[in-house]
Amino acid sequence: MTTQPSKQLETFENPIQTRDYRIHMEIPEFTCLCPKTGQPDFARLTLDYIPDKKCIELKSLKLYIWSYRNEGTFHEAVTNQILDDLVIAMKPRFIRLTSKFYVRGGIFTNVVAEHRKKGWHPQPPVFLESFDEQFNTRS
């Protein structure tokens, strides 16, 4: 059982390479240190990506995220570094990382970074009518 943080991201083969589909992940407990004060910064990371040939392995992602816990870094830098490392590991068709940092000095900071694979174009969205919430009994 691994009990140490790691910068090593692992991947596995995308089981459905013929289709664009979105993988959505929420990482509610990201921490790093403010490079100016050494105080902890906390953020909720949201990762959305459309894989190409590889997907990110979750345990390695957890250990990778953990590796920033004692690292001093600016919000903008860490968001872009994480995105760059994920792009190198997976080479996805599309990836977006949103970092929502908790209040610091009365200011909330949100950083959004994204990458599109050269030559990839998303399919146009399909909007479907919503249904009312369903219950197991009819009224």
From Swiss-Prot:
Pathway: tRNA modification; tRNA-queuosine biosynthesis. It is an enzyme of class 1 (oxidoreductase). Pfam families: QueF. It catalyses: 7-aminomethyl-7-carbaguanine + 2 NADP(+) = 7-cyano-7-deazaguanine + 2 NADPH + 3 H(+). Keywords: Cytoplasm, NADP, Oxidoreductase, Queuosine biosynthesis. Catalyzes the NADPH-dependent reduction of 7-cyano-7-deazaguanine (preQ0) to 7-aminomethyl-7-deazaguanine (preQ1). This is NADPH-dependent 7-cyano-7-deazaguanine reductase.
